Amino acid sequence: MTRKEQLAAVAVEDMVVFSPEGETRDYIAVFTDVTCFYCQKLHREVDQLTDKGIEVRYLAFPRGGVDSEGAQKLATAWCAEDQQNTLTELKAGVELPVNDCADNPIAAQYQLGQDMGVSGTPAIVTSSGLMVPGYRPADDLVALLGLD
C-alpha cells in the first residue's frame, strides 16, 4: 500500500485538523509530538500554511512510544472538546491535566507512522504521499506543494 493509500484509510475525524478560512487548495498530514521542539516550531507557522489554502492534518506520533508522557499529552489533545486549542496550548508548554479517553487513536496513529517509515517528528506527508522528514519552513512547504 502506498503512503497516499495509507493516509486515505485514516478518517480525517481522527486527526486534529487546522483548516483554511477560505478554499482548501491542498493538505499536509503531519506526524507530531507535543514535546518535540521542531513540531512546536512548525505549529507556530500553521497560520501561514492555512492562509495559503493548505489544511494541516495532525497525526499523533509520541516519540517515546504509546506509554510515554508524550503519548498522554497527545491523548489529552485528541480527547479534548477543543482539540485545536488544546494541542496549541500543549505545544506552547502549557501544563494541562491528562485527559485520556478510551477511544483515542494515539496507538493506531503511532503504528501507522511506524508502518510508513516515520523515525522522528515532525514527519510531513503531502497529499501525493511524499514524505518530508523533519521541520521545513512554511514557505518551503508552500513551494513544495506548488502553491506559492
What are the roles of these predicted feature ranges?
Residues 1-30, 34-64, 98-120, 141-148:
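Extracytoplasmic thiol/disulfide redox context detector
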Residues 65-142:
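Thiol/selenol-based redox catalytic cores and closely related redox-interacting motifs
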